[in-house]
């Protein structure tokens, strides 16, 4: 409420990369507040420049780790939704522990969502989609949802384009807080 006092709908964009999808959504949905969280400094700078160019006032950016943001900066029942578009799949077996969409993460973000709040994920890495679906299955008392068709409102990101050029199948998933 402190950073978005006049917006009724609040969406957190986790790992917005270079920010192209966030900027497009901010322009297309000016009545929605977007909180972008990113650790990659060049992406933060690129999104700032994009937002200035479109004169957007409905985005706030945190250059921080999302776990720290959730633990230290987000109030409970403060988010209407979370977007996680093309997270790093951490493909190597020894790196799987770094994946974001674990049952522990899903439990951590759950109280920050309003009743009926959602998490929308898109990935072009089938093993990561399977991993995410298994993680949600492990916390089925908290969320309900599944794989969905790509929504028309979701912009195609640079990472998605790269995946499509490699003939990767893009999977969208949407889960609603119970």
Language-model regions: role of each:
Residues 40:
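Conserved SAM/SAH-binding beta-strand->alpha-helix loop
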Residues 44-46, 129:
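Short alpha-helix immediately C-terminal to the canonical SAM-binding loop
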Residues 131-178:
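Class I S-adenosyl-L-methionine
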Residues 13:
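Class I SAM-dependent methyltransferase core
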Residues 48-76:
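S-adenosyl-L-methionine
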Residues 115-123:
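Conserved beta-strand signature within the Rossmann-like core of class I S-adenosyl-L-methionine
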Residues 19-23:
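Glycine-rich SAM-binding Motif I of class I
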Residues 101-115:
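A short glycine-rich, Lys/Arg-flanked "PGG" loop and its adjoining helix->strand segment in the class I
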